[in-house]
């Protein structure tokens, strides 16, 4: 199960929070979902080079607040914050409601799965060898403190006639462990040979309750050594 489903959706309410935070009525649910989709699609396309890792949308009775978490917030803010005001007006015009836009910096950009996937995609579009691109991203994630990272690329790799899937794994990525904090990101690289899909899983550690000690696995538990018997 953990190998197939989206690891973020599997852990919602356990160690991950929702990116859309609001309580709808039966009548407002379709409208709110449609507005959230429009906002995210617009911001991801317009601010692609700012390195967006998350877009959080919060609603109250009369207000709508959008928080953009980006690796390069200076590109979004602009001189004296003028670009943020223009962005706010464009989003408000898009959905026909007043919107408050906040910008936050992604402090550990190399440990963000979404940014890692987009980084690999950008390198593939620049004709960098896919193995080199994957290894570079893995090294960056490990330097940022990631406990494990897995990258999968699928498509006509290196211009091959037949599509295939290749993946690299460094450290450990326990997808079945619900207390494991795992970040997940996907991206597409548009190359002359066709589209290449990229998936990234980053394991950032385990979230434990206070006073609960993790059980030792067979690998961590001390192993008993057996003495070899001598023949008579």
From Swiss-Prot:
Question: Which GO molecular function, any one, fits this protein according to its record?
Answer: rRNA binding
**Pfam families attached here?**
KH_2 (PF07650), Ribosomal_S3_C (PF00189)
Q: Where is this region: Disordered?
A: 211-232
Report the SMART domains cross-referenced here: KH
Q: Which GO terms describe its biological process?
A: translation
Q: Which residue stretches does the UniProt record annotate as biased composition, category Basic and acidic residues?
A: 213-223
Q: Which InterPro entries match?
A: KH_dom, KH_dom-like_a/b, KH_dom_type_2, KH_sf_prok-type, Ribosomal_S3_C_sf, Ribosomal_uS3_bac-typ, Ribosomal_uS3_C, Ribosomal_uS3_CS
Residue limits of the KH type-2 domain?
Answer: 39-107
The UniProt keywords, alphabetically, are:
Ribonucleoprotein, Ribosomal protein, RNA-binding, rRNA-binding
Domain of life (superkingdom): Bacteria
Q: Which GO terms describe its cellular component?
A: cytosolic small ribosomal subunit
Instruction: Note the subunit structure.
Output: Part of the 30S ribosomal subunit. Forms a tight complex with proteins S10 and S14.
The family annotation for this protein states:
Belongs to the universal ribosomal protein uS3 family.
Briefly state the protein's biological role: Binds the lower part of the 30S subunit head. Binds mRNA in the 70S ribosome, positioning it for translation.
Q: What is this protein called?
A: Small ribosomal subunit protein uS3
